Amino acid sequence: MLIPIPALNDNYIWVYKRENLSVIVIDIPEIAALSQFIQAQNLVIGALLITHNHRDHIGALAEFKQFYPHVHIYGPAECADQGVTQVIDAGRLIIDEYHIDVLPTGGHTAQHLSFLIDGHLFCGDTLFSAGCGRVFTGDYSQMFTSLQLLKSLPDETIVCPAHEYTLGNLAFALTTGKNKSAVQKQLEKVKKLRAENKPSLPTTLALEKQINPFLQVESLDEFIELRKAKDVF
């Protein structure tokens, strides 16, 4: 089971479940939509994973702890004072029978983490469909390195970003002149999905390599120029 639960204006709370196992939840911008889904599906939460410390990813952490006081909450050191029960760094995390690769994807924030579970990449605000996150408390070199790391994953990796930014990102991607036919084709597909109030996500790494200009840059300088152009688009 892989479910993107809409939250706030354009966030997704990702819920992942393997058969006969508990649920893994990624980020918690608000509690109502998640708790309603968990109750309706009669599910048990095994863990909450936090990608970074921005409010639209941890805003309901205190409420989550009230609803689910026995659930462990894992997150980066930048979330240590926000209510996580276990601070983690890059490496391997084992929860129930889930073997989770914790990836260092700083750039958007300095200690941003991404999580790879059974070929599903939960990448927070590092990689979006056709785009990437802004650089805030991290730096451009970090973000470029993080994107190169994610780009090196298998093409069949299912990519689960935290925001529904795809339409705007595709509009910008068209202006770069890279793979315009593939970008235009995906833009038309996403327009139809969004008109039906359906998510454009998840995506795949194979598709992102075709339509995402930030995965096509070959140098840090090129990345910085592109990221600054997107910042004012």
Swiss-Prot record:
**Highest taxon of the source?**
Bacteria
- InterPro entries according to UniProt: Clx_II_MBL (IPR035680), Glyoxalase_II_hydrolase (IPR050110), HAGH_C (IPR032282), Hydroxyacylglutathione_Hdrlase (IPR017782), Metallo-B-lactamas (IPR001279), RibonucZ/Hydroxyglut_hydro (IPR036866)
Q: Does the keyword Hydrolase apply?
A: yes
Q: Tell me the Gene Ontology biological-process terms attached to this UniProt entry.
A: methylglyoxal catabolic process to D-lactate via S-lactoyl-glutathione
Recorded hits in Pfam families, A to Z, give: HAGH_C (PF16123), Lactamase_B (PF00753)
Subunit: Monomer.
What is the protein's known function?
A: Thiolesterase that catalyzes the hydrolysis of S-D-lactoyl-glutathione to form glutathione and D-lactic acid.
Spell out the protein name for this chain: Hydroxyacylglutathione hydrolase
Origin species, per record, is Histophilus somni (strain 129Pt) (Haemophilus somnus)
Q: What is the lineage of its organism?
A: Bacteria, Pseudomonadati, Pseudomonadota, Gammaproteobacteria, Pasteurellales
